[in-house]
Structures are given as structure tokens and as C-alpha cells.
A protein has these predicted regions:
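Surface-exposed patches in structured soluble domains
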Residues: 36-42, 123, 130-176, 207-209, ...
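Structural microfeature recognizing short secondary-structure transition sites
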Residues: 200-263, 267-268
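Short coil-to-beta-strand transition motifs
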Residues: 1-3, 18, 130-131, 194-205, ...
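Amphipathic alpha-helical coiled-coil segments and their boundaries
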Residues: 44, 51, 58, 85, ...
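Low-complexity, intrinsically disordered
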Residues: 160, 179-205, 215-216
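Long, amphipathic coiled-coil "stalk"/hairpin helices in large membrane-associated assemblies
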Residues: 2-61, 132, 136-144, 150-152, ...
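Extended amphipathic alpha-helical segments
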Residues: 2-3, 60, 64-68, 72, ...
Length: 269
């Protein structure tokens, strides 16, 4: 048996950052430390007024560009007719005489105006700050009524789909492992975890995920990463266990290689 110890950490940790500036108009009841949310759920909302006005302005400019294009198409058609009255082939007409550059400019203005509308729409959407995944808030930096600038961290969150435990293994520990443990065959290997939850001793079952394949300089150890799924809503073999909270310190053990010519002896009383 190989034993080690480690701390439960989230697999995914995120700083939620505002991409727009403005005053926070509302926050979710779940926007508190420990608040649990689902992917896509609204966490907070920045005042959208300036961005609504910007979108309206962009849409108005687009309508103006569309009107200008209609006008330019009519002038271009009239220029072609006037050229045809001369009796000369249309292929001999200068581009300026047919207003081709003006028509191209009007079409380009349409594309630019559409891009500005899309940009304004995206900015408006970003006033609604939603959860990127199912998770929990571990730190909040702002609250309702506060002005925030673009790039300001609003909160720190972590995902609750998986947690990981990094287990340091010394050379002595590694010598107890089988050759297959250093290959992809390691993945999914059962790892027993023991720790405290709600003041009581608890146990969980995890699965080996990967070796980090780097020797830590401080302790000359390699790290085995163990994964536990749905730690805050345990299922399967862990369905009767207490939630495995981020930050919990656990002791882990798993079966190593079988040693030949070794027998278990009963301890004398």
C-alpha cells in the first residue's frame, strides 16, 4: 500500500472580471461567499443605460448607411443610362462616370455600420455577468451600487464538477508502485481518501488521474493527481459520504505492486 497526504483543490478556479464599466444595479442572492450557482445563471448586472444608447446610435447609423446605399445605387443606375445615351459601349465608361467608387464606398459603410451594431450589442450583453459553469463563489470583491471599470475582478469562483488532490510521492513510495502505474493504465485506479467533514471522520473514493511528470525541487517528490467527481453532490460509491469540501486535508492510500515471496504474519499478542 502506498500512502500520502494532500489538500482538496478545485480543478477549475476563475476570476470573474467585468468587461464593461458602470454601476452595479443588481446582484443575485447567490452572489455571496459560499453561494452555489449553475452555468448561465445571472450573478450580477451592470447599469446598461449607456450601452443601450450606444446600440440605438449604432442601429441609427446603420439605417443611414442603408439609405445612402439606396441613394447611391439610384445615382449609379442614372449614370449608366446617361452614358448609354452617348451611344458608346458601357465598357468604355470611366469608373467615376458610372459612380463605381461611390457605390463601393456606400457598401463598405454598410459593413462597417453592421460591425458597430454587433459590437454595441455584445457590449450590452456583457452588462449581464453570468456563471461560466456550475460552481461556488469563494471570494467576492464588489456589491450593489459600486462602480466598476472594465478589467476589474468581481469575484473568484471554482467549479464543482471535480476536485483534485495532489499527492506527493517520494522515491520510496514510487518504488512500491507497479510499472503500469507509470503509464496511462494508472488512470481510474481506485484511491481511498480519509479526512474530516463537519467535525467527523469521513472517507471517500477517488480515482487516479495523472502523474505530473515533474520532480518538485523543494521535496524531490513527484505528484500523483487524484480526482473526485461531484464533490458537493456525491454520487455512486460516495453517495453516503459527506461533501468533500475544497480545502479539506486528506490522507490517501492505494494498492501498489505485489511483492514476490512476501507473506503477511500475524502479530503476536
Amino acid at each position: 500500500t502506498v500512502e500520502s497526504q494532500g489538500t482538496v483543490e478545485p480543478r477549475t478556479r476563475t476570476n470573474i472580471v467585468s468587461e464593461v464599466s458602470g454601476t452595479i444595479l443588481s446582484v443575485s442572492d447567490k452572489f455571496v461567499v459560499g453561494g452555489k450557482f449553475e452555468v448561465g445563471e445571472l450573478l450580477l448586472r451592470v447599469d446598461p443605460t449607456d450601452y443601450q444608447v450606444a446600440l440605438q446610435r449604432a442601429e441609427a447609423l446603420l439605417k443611414g448607411a442603408e439609405a445612402q446605399l439606396i441613394f447611391e445605387k439610384a445615382r449609379s443606375a442614372q449614370a449608366k443610362k446617361e452614358w448609354e445615351f452617348t451611344g458608346r459601349p458601357l465598357s468604355e465608361a470611366p469608373l467615376l462616370a458610372l459612380r463605381v467608387p461611390y457605390l463601393a464606398e456606400a457598401e463598405a459603410n454598410i459593413e462597417q455600420a453592421k460591425a458597430e451594431v454587433e459590437r454595441a450589442r455584445v457590449k450590452l450583453e456583457k452588462t449581464r455577468i453570468t456563471a461560466p459553469y456550475n460552481g461556488i463563489i469563494s471570494r467576492k470583491n464588489v456589491d450593489i451600487g459600486q462602480f466598476v471599470s472594465a478589467g476589474i475582478p468581481l469575484a473568484e469562483t471554482f467549479a464543482v464538477d471535480f476536485v483534485e488532490i495532489r499527492l506527493p510521492l517520494s522515491d520510496q513510495d514510487l518504488s512500491k508502485m507497479s510499472d503500469s502505474d507509470f503509464t496511462d493504465a494508472l488512470r481510474g485506479k481506485k484511491v481511498n481518501l480519509l479526512g474530516f467533514a463537519n467535525g467527523r471522520s469521513s472517507s471517500w473514493e477517488g480515482q487516479a488521474e495523472r502523474f505530473e511528470r515533474v520532480v518538485e525541487q523543494t521535496n524531490r517528490s513527484q505528484y500523483l493527481v487524484v480526482r473526485v467527481g461531484n464533490p458537493y453532490d456525491l454520487k455512486g460509491s460516495n453517495s453516503r459520504a459527506n461533501p468533500l469540501l475544497v480545502g479539506t486535508f486528506v490522507t490517501a492510500d492505494f494498492v501498489g505492486r505485489e511483492l514476490p515471496n512476501v507473506f503477511k504474519l500475524r502479530r503476536s499478542g
